[in-house]
């Protein structure tokens, strides 16, 4: 990790598109501070890189790292429809094709279905050096959706009626019946350091998913349960200080520090 001076306080932001092997356009933003390490942020379902919570995460991590954000297909400014993790691995691979040659160290933080996609990619792709996996489903067919446990004010009104909560939201859904890999079958193939973070109040994907994935992870690993924490990106809304501190500490410990 490179120590940044005051002149790097305002990053250079590059926006563009990447093309996947199956010809989809993937929209990205690259925040460049001159760091030797980059953190890739992979959003969850119904979110995008424009989500204010992820923009806040970018600001929090951008003081120490360059940041690369992108939209999965069917979300934000990317093309196509969302295939419920079946083909979105091509989107992350296109990101790694572009970003991996530019940095000596690459971290990835992924949320919910984005984390599920990431596990399936990282099982065979070794171009990421450290991984933070937030609220990941261990098996797409076993997502919980405990509707009776949701907080109507925070979980529904925030998205539908809050002006900030609506920014960056939306999805263009595609076929859900396509074959899907199971993260629980792939997590054991990942050899890089992995930290799992899950909110204890997550009603969409219950904490047992992260616990099951953690048990099958063979390398350096850690699991964090945030008491009363909600699902995925909303941990940044309700517990930003704790969430950011855990992420920063993990990447500090698992990405090689380069002082230059």
Predicted features and spans:
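Hydrolase active-site cap/lid region
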Residues: 123-176
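Conserved alpha/beta-hydrolase
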Residues: 58-79
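Short beta-strand/loop motif that positions the catalytic acidic residue
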Residues: 190-191, 196-198, 202
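Acidic catalytic loop of the alpha/beta-hydrolase fold
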Residues: 201-205, 233
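Catalytic nucleophile-loop/oxyanion-hole region of alpha/beta-hydrolase
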Residues: 73-102
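N-terminal cap/lid segment of alpha/beta-hydrolase-fold proteins
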Residues: 1-33
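The serine-hydrolase catalytic nucleophile loop
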Residues: 45-58
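Catalytic histidine-centered segment of alpha/beta-hydrolase-like enzymes
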Residues: 229-240
């Amino acid at each position: 990790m490179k120590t940044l001076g005051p002149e790097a306080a305002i990053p250079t932001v590059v926006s563009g598109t990447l093309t996947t092997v199956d010809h989809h356009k993937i929209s990205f933003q690259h925040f460049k501070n001159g760091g030797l390490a980059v953190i890739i942020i992979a959003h969850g379902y119904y979110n995008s890189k424009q989500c204010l919570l992820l923009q806040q995460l970018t600001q929090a991590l951008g003081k120490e790292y360059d940041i690369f954000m992108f939209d999965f297909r069917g979300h934000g400014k990317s093309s196509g429809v969302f295939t419920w993790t079946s083909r979105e691995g091509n989107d992350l691979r296109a990101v790694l094709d572009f970003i991996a040659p530019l940095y000596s160290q690459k971290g990835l933080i992924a949320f919910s279905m984005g984390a599920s996609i990431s596990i399936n990619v990282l099982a065979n792709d070794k171009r990421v050096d450290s991984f933070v996996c937030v609220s990941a489903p261990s098996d797409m067919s076993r997502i919980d959706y405990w509707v009776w446990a949701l907080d109507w004010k925070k979980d529904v009104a925030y998205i539908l009626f809050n002006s900030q909560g609506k920014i960056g939201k939306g999805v263009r859904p595609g076929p859900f019946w396509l074959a899907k890999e199971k993260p629980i079958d792939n997590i054991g193939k990942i050899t890089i350091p992995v930290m799992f973070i899950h909110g204890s109040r997550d009603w969409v994907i219950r904490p047992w998913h992260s616990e099951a994935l953690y048990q099958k992870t063979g390398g350096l690993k850690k699991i964090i349960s945030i008491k009363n924490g909600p699902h995925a990106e909303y941990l940044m809304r309700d517990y930003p200080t704790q969430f950011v501190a855990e992420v920063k500490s993990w990447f500090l410990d698992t990405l090689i520090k380069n002082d230059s």
